Amino acid sequence: MGKVYDWFEERLEIQAIADDITSKYVPPHVNIFYCLGGITLTCFLVQVATGFAMTFYYRPTVTEAFASVQYIMVEVNFGWLIRSIHRWSASMMVLMMILHVFRVYLTGGFKKPRELTWVTGVILAVLTVSFGVTGYSLPWDQIGYWAVKIVTGVPEAIPVIGSPLVELLRGSFSVGQSTLTRFYSLHTFILPFLTAVFMLMHFLMIRKQGISGPL
């Protein structure tokens, strides 16, 4: 094992990376409220794991979506638990994100030189809400259907570009299979990818600049 470690150490400098991670200075004013961002990340990882598990059984079609969700809840071993954890973690992620934003704002964590960290955080907040909007529709029950119809109909009030924007969101003039497919793609591929990218940027900037000082 020693030779294997030495081989990787020579090429990757693992010890230097470990020393950097474990030797970061933590200001004395830091308290439990500074953990809200980390809790949000943990919730996101839980979402990825449970969501990935459900993709093995979920069918993104208007005729089979609801039945596949019922199958997960009733027939799949611990399917009810996986979906319940996914829902609970989603609510927790939104709550922790909101509290994290308030903490950063109230402690002045958005000020120079951390403006870009704040910008990436705001983008992550928008992505988090987008997860909720797209995920809510996937069971394709009455609540999900009408929620999608209302949400996608909101941009219609925008002059000139309103109607084309609605058609872009729905995939057609009315809510249907194209809408569900788009929301499923957003929820399971595009939004997780964007969230991972901006989270990486967010944490790298925090590592570089450190935690903001007290007011």
Curated annotation (Swiss-Prot):
Keywords on record: Chloroplast, Electron transport, Heme, Iron, Membrane, Metal-binding, Photosynthesis, Plastid, Thylakoid, Transmembrane, Transmembrane helix, Transport
Binding site for heme b 2: 86, 187
Transmembrane segments: 32-52, 90-110, 116-136, 186-206
CDD domains: Cytochrome_b_N
Top-level taxon in the UniProt lineage: Eukaryota
GO BP: photosynthesis; respiratory electron transport chain
Compartment list: Plastid, Chloroplast thylakoid membrane
Gene Ontology CC entries for this record: chloroplast thylakoid membrane
Cofactor: heme b; heme c
Binding annotation for heme c: 35
Positions bound to heme b 1: 100, 202
GO molecular-function term, one example from the UniProt record: oxidoreductase activity
SUPFAM superfamilies xrefs: Transmembrane di-heme cytochromes (SSF81342)
Subunit structure: The 4 large subunits of the cytochrome b6-f complex are cytochrome b6, subunit IV (17 kDa polypeptide, PetD), cytochrome f and the Rieske protein, while the 4 small subunits are PetG, PetL, PetM and PetN. The complex functions as a dimer.
Free-text function comment from the UniProt entry: Component of the cytochrome b6-f complex, which mediates electron transfer between photosystem II (PSII) and photosystem I (PSI), cyclic electron flow around PSI, and state transitions.
Family membership: Belongs to the cytochrome b family. PetB subfamily.
Misc. remarks from the entry: Heme 1 (or BH or b566) is high-potential and absorbs at about 566 nm, and heme 2 (or BL or b562) is low-potential and absorbs at about 562 nm.
HAMAP family: Cytb6_f_cytb6
Protein name per UniProt: Cytochrome b6
Organism: Welwitschia mirabilis
Origin organism lineage: Eukaryota, Viridiplantae, Streptophyta, Embryophyta, Tracheophyta
